Amino acid sequence: MNFDRARKKMVQEQIATRGITDRRVLDAMLKTPRHIFVQEAMAAQAYSDSSLPVGEKQTISQPYTVALMTELLELTGREKVLEIGTGSGYQTAILAALADRVYTVERIRPLALRARKCLDSLRLFNVMLRINDSEGSPIGWDEEAPFDAIIVTAGAPAVPQVLTDQLAVDGRLVIPVGDEREQRLVKIVRKNDGTLETTTSIGCRFVPLIGRQGW
């Protein structure tokens, strides 16, 4: 299979034609090999318009969803970004191509170790990965806050205040919010006066966020 050709087709037909216009996001997805982040047996499906299982009851998100969430973060290349839920590491790699520094947290150790290996193979050394497998631990990376952008790759019942507290002024948080079966993408922006501006985007379905801020 020609992965380069499949990746180009993915960007053109699944992402650009559905309204993603940020050239930097499109370029990052064109250059990032999604197939190395999926199980070897599923490599041929890596550029399909769907999420795929990556083990440990977790999934790699649909390419369009990755592109949309990334575009909503409005990254320029100077940001410090927090990712909750490293998963396969694919979303992390896209962020690393678009931001100055990425801090990513994963609760499932085998996933985190596989993701780290993939990220290192791409020489993405601006990624700091933490394994936080304690159920009672607070969400986020408080000692490195504030963050210019925060992305959550699991569905939550509400926007966790502990994350909005870690946003810098003008910082953006993108998170799926809803119930365990269906959510909507929510974008939060922290304004100069400390208030939070909320907008809602498309419906989506993510694995549930686990812990005190989830289920």
Curated annotation (Swiss-Prot):
Q: What family is it from?
A: Belongs to the methyltransferase superfamily. L-isoaspartyl/D-aspartyl protein methyltransferase family.
Q: What is this protein called?
A: Protein-L-isoaspartate O-methyltransferase 1
According to its UniProt record, the EC number is: 2.1.1.77
Q: Write out the function statement from the record.
A: Catalyzes the methyl esterification of L-isoaspartyl residues in peptides and proteins that result from spontaneous decomposition of normal L-aspartyl and L-asparaginyl residues. It plays a role in the repair and/or degradation of damaged proteins.
Recall the GO molecular function terms of this protein's record.
protein-L-isoaspartate (D-aspartate) O-methyltransferase activity
Residues at the catalytic site: 61
Q: What's the encoding gene here? A: pcm1
What superkingdom heads the lineage?
Bacteria
Q: List, alphabetically, the SUPFAM superfamilies matched.
A: S-adenosyl-L-methionine-dependent methyltransferases
Tell me where it resides: Cytoplasm
What biological-process terms (Gene Ontology) are attached?
methylation; protein modification process; protein repair
Catalytic activity reported: [protein]-L-isoaspartate + S-adenosyl-L-methionine = [protein]-L-isoaspartate alpha-methyl ester + S-adenosyl-L-homocysteine
Any one GO CC term of this protein is: cytoplasm
InterPro entries in UniProt: PCMT, SAM-dependent_MTases_sf
Query: Sorted alphabetically, which keywords does the UniProt record give?
Result: Cytoplasm, Methyltransferase, S-adenosyl-L-methionine, Transferase
